[in-house]
Amino acid sequence: MAGGGGRPHDGPARLGTILGKARSGGQTVEEALTRWLVYPGVLRADLLTAAGVLISLGVSLHILMRKRVVGSAIGWTGLVWLSPVFGTALYLTFGLNRVERRARKLKRRPSQQYDETPQAPASVPEAYAPLDRAVRAITNLPTVAGTDITVYRNGDEAYPAMLEAIAGARSSVALSSYIFLDDEIGQTFIAALKQAMDRGCQVRVILDGIGSGYFYPAAWRRLRRLGVPAGLFMHSVLPWRMPFLNLRTHKKLLILDGRVAFTGGVNISDGNRVARKPKFPIRDTHFRIEGPVVEQLTQAFLVDWAFVAGEELEGEAWMPRLSPAGHLTARVVTSGPDADIEKIATVVLQAIACARTSIRLTTPYFLPNDLIVSALCLAAARGIAVDVVIPRRSDHRIVDWATRAHIDPLLENGVRVWLDEPPFDHSKALSIDGEWCFIGSANWDSRSFRLNFELNVEVYDPGLARRLDAFILDKCETPLTRADLDARPHLVRLRDAAVRLLLPYL
């Protein structure tokens, strides 16, 4: 019963009475309706209830049609029915995972991709032909021969090489970074980009709207003041204009003249210059890539720039003819909450399924979904050596807590988990059988596999794979055992288990 002692059937009668008095008393209909709506009776509550039901029903229909993960669909549906307004607001902010972007087809030349050189056939080891075929179906891209890859450790090695490449660019510079700070190294990069533009290069820069600083990142403001074309990915300081708060571009890409590319895990910040002993040093691994596969990297950037700025970049400045630069075979794999959803995760599953002797990976954050956990467990069960290296302490304490509550099935099934001692290592690498490897920006968590826009490169090359193998095995000094997990105090285990429920969004 509502205030004023009204009953449900009193509402229409009360409305009729108010309208009658309005006609006799000279009130307008609007004034009469205002009196009726603010009258402390049941009808007002009924209208609010009906509105809540309609909102919950509409959002529930959207959830049923869009959410493929059953647990996620059940959770969101329950929340919007328990609290229509609050639940709907959260769903619009964090629950919408798909973004419509204009597709841009890869423009391959029909017969020749290299300067006066017939396109070299990309061959892969016979044992990996099924994996090659599967990834081609997933990405709709071919493996490309003629690739050369150089490995850099930390910003100490990567930054000088990147800055030298920017200084040598003659036609175009494309840069995309999740974190781009306006600190000493950030300002050095900004100055280099400005100089490239001043000597006639076309320069385009993408910063993530969350990773580089929410309220108009300082590096973005400095670039704009200097006249350097720079865009923020999925960003607005107005919440109602930014319904995709949870979706970010996590790519790290630098492409010079469409011929030389850098990618991997290194962001642009002073923390990555480990030799200078920053307050929180961040170790990492980055890669310089040359050869025809750079065209696939460039296409990934051009799609993002068209989405951010609405500008289609064309011509030889961005897409020149490319010559072989090495002997590696490679292919780009992009992933994101659009048409590319979960492509990197699917490639990882395919690679695990094709493994014959070893699976070795290092990642700063390890919270994969149950499918990938099960795949690793099954691989270990069939006798494959599976080694997973995670930081003892990452830069996100909550993720560390959730990880401890997530890995027990792996340890139970024979997967070896190792703790990488500080300083924190942000490197991401996967090596299979010492012959195939997967490098790039994606972490092994649900955010990278499903929510973020990511870019990885698969490489068929024993030399690089074994180098990454050695890099990963060198970290395998401190094992994490089930006894270690069981030794945690009960309250700590309870905290970790509770935080794990946030797995889809950590």
Where are these regions (language model features)?
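N-terminal localization/anchoring segments of enzymes in phospholipid and broader phosphate metabolism
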Residues: 6, 15-346, 350, 354, ...
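Long hydrophobic segments that form regular secondary structure
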Residues: 348-358, 378-381
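Active-site donor-binding acidic/aromatic loop of nucleotide-activated sugar
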Residues: 417-421
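Short hydrophobic alpha-helical segments enriched in small aliphatic residues
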Residues: 10-11
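Helical hairpin unit composed of two closely spaced alpha helices linked by a short loop
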Residues: 365-386, 391-392, 396
